[in-house]
Amino acid sequence: RIKPNGDLNYSFPVELAELLKDSSVFAKLDLEVMKSFSSKYAFALYEEISRRIGLSYKMTEELDVQELRDLLGVEDGKLITHHNLRAKALEPALSEVNAITPYQVTIIPKKKGRKVISFLMGWSIKDVEGMKEAHAELQRPKIGRKDRLSGASSSVVES
């Protein structure tokens, strides 16, 4: 609201105010990137990597299975098997984060026998060429991104 003397008063909704309190994270998140995610798991991974990217002493982290599920925001009782977790949450999140953000993220499963016991997560900032590619993908429509990233061909059909 603008007062007669020219002062401008404004307020933030409570939810946004809570988010802004943690300005160290919010300042690192790019609104354009955040709006471009189609996966909630990609958004969660992007937020967590943004928190870690400035750590000069750490570029990898080992996570047990539950820690990775928590990091991605996978709800309890959902995506129970490793196959489902990988196919429905982890791979789409990695694909999207690596395609449209300035970060390069890898998450490698560590096994004991056939069982996955933990994950090694690594992150870095892309080089100039990688940044250009991410920016170019960010400018393209969301529709068809999944096919572009997987290498599947898609075409528009005239009716």
Language-model segment annotations:
Residues 1-159:
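Charged, alpha-helix-forming regions
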